[in-house]
Amino acid sequence: MRILLLSACLLAAGPALAADDASSCAEGITMIRDALALNPPEAAVPKLKNALRVAEREQKEGEFDECLDAVADARKVLGR
């Protein structure tokens, strides 16, 4: 019985977690665009552009976990 209850809770929480990932992905893409607009160091530009390209592609595909991985890569480049 507990397993059924746990499974039902996880299934019900799924869409909410996906919505959080989707909004975090969109916020991350905005953060990367803003960072590029502020003229970052020359060495960071290609890495940020790559992270932005990957994040945007994964957002379109609905792969928000992979989008968040690209955003995390951009944060590392920026030292955040």
Identify what each model region corresponds to.
Residues M1-A18:
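Classic N-terminal secretory signal peptides
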Residues E56-R80:
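Mid-chain, structured segments of secreted extracytoplasmic proteins
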Residues M1-I3, D34, K76:
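Hydrophobic alpha-helical segments, especially transmembrane helices
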